[in-house]
């Protein structure tokens, strides 16, 4: 039987305050720091900073 992976689901939430988010997963062992990406927010129609928050 395979062991459980070390990956955790995360939510990347827009810093523009629109409430838009992307979901993804990351390996906690290789990247323990919080992720930040410039991604497209369709509500403001611009690329904005998305920061990692825990998926509930």
From Swiss-Prot:
GO terms of biological process kind: translation
Taxonomy, superkingdom: Bacteria
Listed PANTHER family: 54S RIBOSOMAL PROTEIN L39, MITOCHONDRIAL, LARGE RIBOSOMAL SUBUNIT PROTEIN BL33M
Gene3D superfamilies xrefs: Ribosomal protein L33 (2.20.28.120)
Basic and acidic residues: compositionally biased ranges: 1-12
This protein's GO CC annotations: cytosolic large ribosomal subunit
InterPro entries named in the record: Ribosomal_bL33, Ribosomal_bL33_CS, Ribosomal_bL33_sf, Ribosomal_zn-bd
Record has Transmembrane helix as a keyword: no
GO MF annotation: an example: structural constituent of ribosome
Name listed for the protein in its UniProt record: Large ribosomal subunit protein bL33
Presence of keyword Isomerase: no
PROSITE patterns cross-referenced by the UniProt entry: RIBOSOMAL_L33 (PS00582)
Lineage: Bacteria, Pseudomonadati, Pseudomonadota, Betaproteobacteria, Burkholderiales
Family as reported in the entry's similarity comment: Belongs to the bacterial ribosomal protein bL33 family.
Keywords, ordered alphabetically: Ribonucleoprotein, Ribosomal protein
Coiled-coil features, chain-numbered ranges: none
Region of interest: Disordered: 1-27
């Amino acid at each position: 039987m395979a062991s459980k992976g070390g990956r955790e689901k995360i939510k990347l939430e827009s810093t523009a305050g629109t409430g838009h988010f992307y979901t993804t997963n990351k390996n906690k062992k290789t990247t323990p720091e919080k992720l930040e990406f410039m991604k497209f927010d369709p509500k403001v129609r611009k690329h904005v900073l998305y920061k990692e928050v825990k998926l509930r």
